[in-house]
């Protein structure tokens, strides 16, 4: 484990699922951390001398150089909550661009970006926004590391309450078309912080998943039925469900921003029902678990067990929830 050597690290998105874990990992390694929070948010950590929780408005009109000491490293864990076009353009592109503007102004040492492996096949608004900023960062002249994780444990927890309550597990098609190498927030945070001192991670895009084997939706169902000791009930839904809803809503979307946003959420659901969260081999036109770099030691099965043992830890999926 590398030591922070009193380097100053600014974490944007410090209140998020991965951002909180990154802050904790940095503190464990003795970095001096500046965690950005919005004025309306609260970030609660145990009292640590190396932690500075600051309220800043992200934007080019805000002169951060007057509010912050010289920062050595920026880690951006910013991500839009909904994935809708206006939200994605603002958070995934514009706010990150403002961070980059600040980084160039202070001659930053290293910019580490948490992105997503799904940008390999961009079909959605948030993927295009992420990819647009990734390209901007790569051409900026700054040292960068762009981390492309697979699925988070939290992302594969949307049906835990269904199984806990004796309901069926819902899959699209056979439930075996897609797979992922899910990674825990703790392991991903370690990987992100490792990028600071690992020259092999500099100026690269870095796909990363958790320890294998790859997991399909059917595999998730089998785990949950076993862990919660519930009878196996799997309901198969035709992937055409998404196409039907898209056709139904498309004409109305021209007249309603709310419907347009709903349309984008349906597209997101369709994407994840059809695409694996693994390294995409463009030459073979196929996802490949064997070519997806693996990191960490935490397993999805053990995570599900922890949710059984402490139901209060079952995450609230919010706007990301597809199944109720």
Predicted segments, located by residue:
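Non-catalytic, hydrophobic alpha-helical segments
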Residues: 18, 74, 188, 192, ...
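A hydrophobic C-terminal alpha-helical subdomain
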Residues: 240-324
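Glycine/proline-rich active-site loop of Rossmann-fold NAD(P)-dependent oxidoreductases
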Residues: 155-162, 195-206, 229-232
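Substrate-binding strand-loop-helix patch
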Residues: 179-186, 208-226, 239-247
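NAD(P)H-binding glycine-rich loop region in Rossmannoid oxidoreductase-like domains
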Residues: 10, 41-105, 118-120
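N-terminal Rossmann NAD(P)H-binding glycine-rich loop of SDR-like oxidoreductase domains
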Residues: 2, 6-29
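Glycine-/Pro-rich loop/turn segments that contact NAD(P) or position catalytic residues
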Residues: 80-166
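Substrate-positioning beta->alpha
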Residues: 95, 175-196, 204, 216
């Amino acid at each position: 484990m590398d030591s922070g050597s009193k380097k100053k690290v600014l974490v944007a998105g410090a209140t998020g699922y991965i951002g909180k874990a990154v802050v904790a990992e940095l503190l464990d390694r003795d970095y001096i951390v500046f965690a950005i929070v919005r004025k309306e948010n609260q970030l609660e950590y145990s009292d640590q001398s190396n932690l500075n929780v600051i309220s800043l408005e992200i934007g080019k009109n805000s002169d951060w150089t007057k509010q912050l000491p010289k920062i050595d490293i920026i880690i951006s864990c910013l991500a839009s909550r909904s994935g809708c076009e206006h939200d994605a353009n603002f958070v995934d592109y514009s706010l990150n661009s403002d961070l980059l503007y600040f980084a160039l102004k202070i001659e930053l040492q290293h910019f580490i970006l948490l992105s997503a492996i799904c940008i390999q096949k961009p079909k959605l608004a948030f993927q295009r926004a992420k990819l647009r900023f990734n390209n901007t960062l790569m051409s900026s002249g700054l040292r960068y590391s762009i981390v492309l994780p697979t699925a988070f444990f939290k992302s594969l927890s949307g049906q835990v309450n269904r199984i806990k309550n004796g309901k069926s597990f819902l899959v699209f098609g056979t439930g075996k078309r897609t797979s992922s190498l899910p990674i825990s927030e703790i392991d991903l945070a370690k990987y992100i912080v490792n990028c600071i001192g690992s020259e092999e991670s500099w100026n690269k895009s870095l796909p990363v998943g958790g320890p294998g084997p790859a997991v399909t939706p059917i595999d998730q169902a089998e785990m949950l039925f076993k862990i919660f000791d519930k009878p196996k009930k799997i309901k198969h839904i035709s992937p055409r469900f998404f196409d039907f809803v898209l056709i139904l809503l498309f004409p109305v979307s021209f007249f309603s921003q709310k419907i347009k946003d709903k349309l984008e959420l349906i597209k997101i659901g369709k994407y994840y029902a059809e695409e694996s969260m693994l390294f995409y081999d463009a030459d073979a036109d196929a996802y490949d678990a064997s070519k997806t770099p693996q990191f960490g030691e935490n397993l999805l099965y053990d995570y599900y067990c922890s949710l059984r043992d402490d139901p209060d830890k079952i995450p609230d999926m919010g706007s990301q929830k597809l199944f109720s």
